Amino acid sequence: MECQLCPHHCRIAEGKTGLCRSRRNDGGVLVSEVYAKPCSLAIDPIEKKPLYHFHPGTTCLSLACTGCNFRCQNCQNHEISQASLADVDHYELSPSEVVSLCRKHHCPGIAYTYTEPLTYLEYIIDTARLAHEAGLWNILVTAGYVCQEPLKDLLPYLDAANVDLKSFSDDIYKRVSGGHLQPVLDTILAMKQAGVWVEITNLVIPGVNDDMQMVRQMCRWLVDNGLAEAPLHFSRFFPRYKMQDIPPTPLHTLKAARQVAEEEGILHVYLGNV
């Protein structure tokens, strides 16, 4: 059967999982392997997401399940994003228990983060609905690679998101992450149109996506689509996972990217991992 969650449209045989390792064909029905089974829980400052213009100075309960529908060669959380549920320790935590845990630790919101939360969409929606009923925020930290119909089911419960816009080149997306650019742009626009507070992160990798003309095109697209006020975070790359042979991003490259963004009309530009 074919999964309709993301643009990969995986054809999944009986008893098998798709590319994300978290959705299984069980008798012709797609089920989430990781529903209510988070592998990571933490209390983080909201700025760590990073979200700089959404209730700064507050904390959030961060939650992640295993799996991702990208294969980023530079993934900093590959131990869990590229793992199956059986590969890692995990908790048993229902949506109501997540909300109770959040309130117990006096966090005003929940962040679905660290891996690709959209691969466990059902768990997020059920948790996010209860979170809203309890007066809590819902925050998504995502690469944004999802089909628009399932995304619509989540948007009413989403308050803020940081979208990892990995480059402004479809070729780089295919080469580095195994996906495509346009669905990510569609996700950003859908979030904006739904009234979700959006911030953008762009990890600048030397020799991969550090061409300033491409950075300019990305910033121009953001401005042209009404996102000039969306904070843009240029993040510094460090060697990791399958990109151990690439040096850290020079600070002058990040500063050049910031200058380009400001020239194009981005109002809030930040440098991360510096």
Language model region names:
Residues 9-42, 216-218, 222-274:
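A broadly conserved sequence feature marking short terminus-proximal activation segments
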Residues 72, 163, 269:
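Conserved, mostly hydrophobic/aromatic
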